[in-house]
Amino acid sequence: MAESAFPSAQQPLRVGTKDDKAAAFQKISEEDEYEVTSPTDPTFRSANAAAASSSTGSPFFGGSYGENSGPIRFNRSPFDNGPREEDEEGADEFPPEDIRPTGAANQGFPNNYALGRRTSVSAESLNPTSAGSDSWTPPYHEKTEEQLSRLKTAVSSNFLFSHLDDDQFKSVLDALVEKPIPAKGIKVISQGDAGDYFYIVENGHFDFMIHPSGSVQPGPDGMGNKVGSVGPGGSFGELALMYNAPRAATVVSVDPKSTLWALDRITFRRILMDSAFQRRRMYEAFLEEVPLLSSLKPYERAKIADALDAIKYPAGSTIIAEGDPGDAFYLLESGEADAFKNGVEGPVKSYKRGDYFGELALLDDKPRAASIVAKTDVKVAKLGRDGFKRLLGPVEDIMRRAEYESNPVPA
């Protein structure tokens, strides 16, 4: 969890003589000289290069963990992942040239994608601030309404997709690419192989086979024993979307003709990363326009942007009610809303995308002065007072700092 900008370990700011104030704020000024910029700032890489170079193996944007980690074996659900050894005689392999990233021209993929992997749990590093990130668009593969409906049902029931917002969910559905399986006995994935793809079954059936050795062996029984099966609407290989852990089972087609939908890990992670990065940048821009928060440093705005919770309200619903305690601040991310006061006919104020309300709740818990009602379907970003104080300390301290910076105490 991010440290507070005003740790409790520090001595509280004393309100005494002018010399006391000057000394205290001089200390703040000196500390701010070494602050980092927001990761969404275009100068982030150069501004923090020196700090990054002083630490080897940093996890930020390209650092790595566990370079010397050994192989890991999984003996759990067959819906898992992994590297290739020998194939069972008489079984066809799913054509490797068909299993490539679905992004246009593999744009932005690491050079060593899916090459020479060891059987460790890891994932590629992606940098949202790298060149070309702003121009990247998720791949799109056309589907019928019936196909979209079935895929939506299949994806919605999977734990990996339960947290996606509407835009991310749509991008995932659009990125799924159709993979025909033309015959019976084709191995879609092999136990022990590195996993790169998640699959949804459109039609046909597939068996899950596990060999005690952890990989496919030569011979007629090289795939091991059947431990389960999946049919239309089912899915497998979801852990491949998180990291390239070894596949825990072999999946082989049962019917003469089947169809799968596939999504590769790089595209999935890029969708999540790009969406989160753009949302953070938007939130930071919103926060700059809030007078109460205008004195925040870039890294402080980044903290707040990450702490905002997105909430949806249907048209006509009440977001905050007049007279209720003020405990949260809201940014209107999309849609329109109106403010109403008891005894006043019609709205007293209207809000659109980029507007905010409830900011005084960050200062105290006085009752709300008006009700805010959604005029259309809206999406708001919510920040509670407790969350704000946990990240940055009391707003009063920030306002005091802003007052000093605009009117410094003379030496």
Swiss-Prot record:
One of its GO terms (cellular component) is cytosol. Residues 23-159 are annotated as: Dimerization and phosphorylation. Residues 119-136 have a biased composition (Polar residues). It comes from the Eukaryota. Residues 85-96 have a biased composition (Acidic residues). The modification Phosphoserine is found at S120. Signal peptide: none annotated. 3',5'-cyclic AMP 1 binds at residues 160-289. Belongs to the cAMP-dependent kinase regulatory chain family. Tetramer, composed of 2 regulatory (R) and 2 catalytic (C) subunits. In the presence of cAMP it dissociates into 2 active monomeric C subunits and an R dimer. This is cAMP-dependent protein kinase regulatory subunit. It comes from Aspergillus niger. The gene is pkaR.
